[in-house]
Curated annotation (Swiss-Prot):
Transmembrane segments: none annotated. Zn(2+) binds at residues 332, 383, 509. GO terms for cellular component: cytoplasm. Catalyzes the attachment of threonine to tRNA(Thr) in a two-step reaction: L-threonine is first activated by ATP to form Thr-AMP and then transferred to the acceptor end of tRNA(Thr). Also edits incorrectly charged L-seryl-tRNA(Thr). It comes from Francisella tularensis subsp. holarctica (strain LVS). Residues 1-61 form the TGS domain. It catalyses: tRNA(Thr) + L-threonine + ATP = L-threonyl-tRNA(Thr) + AMP + diphosphate + H(+). It is found in: Cytoplasm. The keyword Ligase applies. Belongs to the class-II aminoacyl-tRNA synthetase family. One of its GO terms (molecular function) is metal ion binding. The keyword Heme does not apply. This is Threonine--tRNA ligase. Its EC number is 6.1.1.3. The gene is thrS.
Amino acid sequence: MINIRFPDGSIREFEAGVNSLDVAKSISPSLAKATMAAYIDDQLKDAKDAINSNCELRLITVKDPEGLEILRHSCAHLLAHAVKELYPNTEVTIGPVVDNGFYYDFSFKESIGEADLPTIEKKMKELAKKSAPVSYRVVPKAEAIEFFKAQGENYKVEIIDSIADEQMKIYTQDNFSDLCRGPHIPNTSVLKAFKLTKLAGAYWRGNSDNEMLTRIYGTCWATKEDLEQYLNMLEEAEKRDHRKIGKVLDLFHFQEDSPGIAFWHDNGVRIWRQVEDYMRASNNKYGCSEIRTPLIADFSLWQKSGHASKYAENMFATKSENRDFAIRPMNCPTCVQVYNTKLHSYRDLPIRMAEFGIVHRNEPSGSLHGLLRVRSFTQDDGHIFCTPEQVEEEVILMVQQCFEVYKDFGFNDFAVKIALRPENRIGDDETWDKSEQILKNALDANNVSYELFPGEGAFYGPKIEFHLKDAIGRSWQCGTIQLDFSMPQRLGATYIDKNGEKQVSVMLHRAIVGSLERFIGMLIEHYAGNLPLWLAPVQVAVMGISNNQDDYCKEVFIMLEKNGIRAKLDLRNEKIGFKIREHTLLRVPYLVILGKNEQEQKIITIRKHSGEDLGQMSVDDFCAFLDKQIQAKE
């Protein structure tokens, strides 16, 4: 007999060889039905793995994040199974879990399009209903190679060859087998709520020199209700797509001459200026001086900073006068050069620098996505140089600033995470203990709840991440606050302490909105293009019922502009209904409509974008009304 301890501290006795599924059944049939896998002494295992000794056990169900991930990974296998049934000559490659779903890459011999997805999905449902048990076997590497070679699965053979392990795990359901580390669901019958969503091209191993594969995306959920809710969200997200809205509102465009880099139009630049000016004012409030540093620097700087060894593939390089240069992928090393121009005393610290720094990263073309994933973007970087004693207070201020910014932009629902030390890191445990505690203390001081994520910090320090939730429930990873033990040492950022000794400065990195391009894309989708008044590129459209009001329209327009309102004058010889519809589609917050009565009484009639009639008032009262909203960030 063996003793199994549960998360609540209780201990129960079982026969040796029992598995997690049996344990779940002994508690309740419904728990067994929901069990996907289990943690056995902190190791994630298949639900049918035998337990032969005393242990701690935590059952993983579909309600747990790990359970949902296992469900989705198993659904990717079901997709591959269905494809092999329908297209036997297809070679399967890899099928990982991604946000809210999964994908699988295939090498089809036939031409496959979006129209084929319903057929594949139907086959998946047929296979799931078979309730096939899912099992695995562990075999020597050579045997796994022979097994997949015999099936003509050359990509699997290549994958196995690239793995250092001498033992391979092969999962089987019905007549389909796949290479996988697992764990997987106990039975295919639990796969009931899934949908194939789209098809795309993807190079094998992300290398454009390799074969172009067909990538099929899908989503999978614990219940049909969850699936329906997600599909509704996707439908709403499609309506809010910033690329479509950006075209309608004439904000920006992309073209193949400059892939992954936006061409900003006048309306887009107006939004950009509001975001940048707001952040500049916020930085001033929190004591940051603004700097501007070169986009290009000698490659030796990137070698010293460590970027050359870690980001070389994502860096754009150039040559001039027999010297190697790189376009910066990050702003930190050039910021340190500004700090290093002076000798600093501990009395000078903290020194806070902010920069709207343009960076370039050679992202794969297949990953580019409007403003959300680009090759050139402007980062609202901040770098703080301070003493160890000042770190906690600086982080407290940065957290406070982040919260102010997000709330002003209309994001009131967010999650905060602390990424803790990874296995491969620099610095001793004592330093990491102190650093991680500082981040926790700073969040506690701001009354912020947070989650801990062990192993997800950078090798040079822990960090805080801010994840914003938008109007339709999507989560966006946005700001970061990062402690850095490495770069100040590498680049010689020092100060003189009170004993006259030279010390390495502590460096804090922070980005609040992050990439301005991405943040503006987020804002467009969050508000579905209906930006709040203070951000709207055009705040008021002025129009007359007939051309008889042209002079009065011009007079009102000039008064609005003099009061700092971004107004548009529409004197076209069109029907008033046409003008109203057009400016409504352009998401202009307020429409000023002028007729004979307004002209004679020197008043204006105001209509909101929503269609609500605000009645009549003087131009001065309207300007005061608008200014109140703008100041309140409404």
